[in-house]
């Protein structure tokens, strides 16, 4: 009986080593579970932080609407700048151009106005005197071409500009009249864009020749021209004489040589 009771007690009584081992295993299991929970919480926090960071980056990026708005504002600003530049260029082109003034070889001044009028003036002691205006009118409002001007000389020696289709006629009184030559229009003819009013009387300022001072100046001018022509003819005559003298000298030399040869021949024959 005692033996059986000991065996049962030995079987039912707990062993101290197994209890310690079970407690250690449970402690390790708790540590593993706590580590897994901490890792899961860290992973969840990392995922939340990365999602928040991506959301912040997307929030900081400009939207397509904002980009389109910026581009449209820059386009309107560029158009405004172009409009201002065009306004400035239009203001610059609307400035008036000064009237050009030309001077001929005789000292006469010619001014071409913007409306096509020719203003003729001769220089004087007190400035420009004797202003004459020649009105130029367009024969066709839609035709455009080139106007050809030519010189015409008045009775007092002044030169004026008239179109190429004008004829200048001097009357017995000394006045100058210009007449226009009109041509029948055809398909091959050039358009006549500038026409001078016909007839236009150009009265000379110094038509009277009774002034003794003017007569004296004319006489002196003619004398100077005659003296210049006389000197030119004298120079030509002297040059011609010099050439003739040179030719005669050459002939004289040849004759002297022939004479010497004849003398030698005669002396030889006489011996």
UniProtKB/Swiss-Prot annotation:
Residues 241-262 are annotated as: Leucine-zipper. Keywords: Activator, Chromosomal rearrangement, DNA-binding, Isopeptide bond, Nucleus, Phosphoprotein, Transcription, Transcription regulation, Ubl conjugation. Residues 215-239 are annotated as: Basic motif. The modification Phosphoserine is found at residues 63, 198. There is a cross-link at residues 208, 215 (Glycyl lysine isopeptide (Lys-Gly) (interchain with G-Cter in SUMO2)). Binds DNA as a dimer. Interacts with HIPK2 and CDK3. Interacts with MOTS-c, a peptide produced by the mitochondrially encoded 12S rRNA MT-RNR1; the interaction occurs in the nucleus following metabolic stress. This is Cyclic AMP-dependent transcription factor ATF-1. The gene is ATF1.
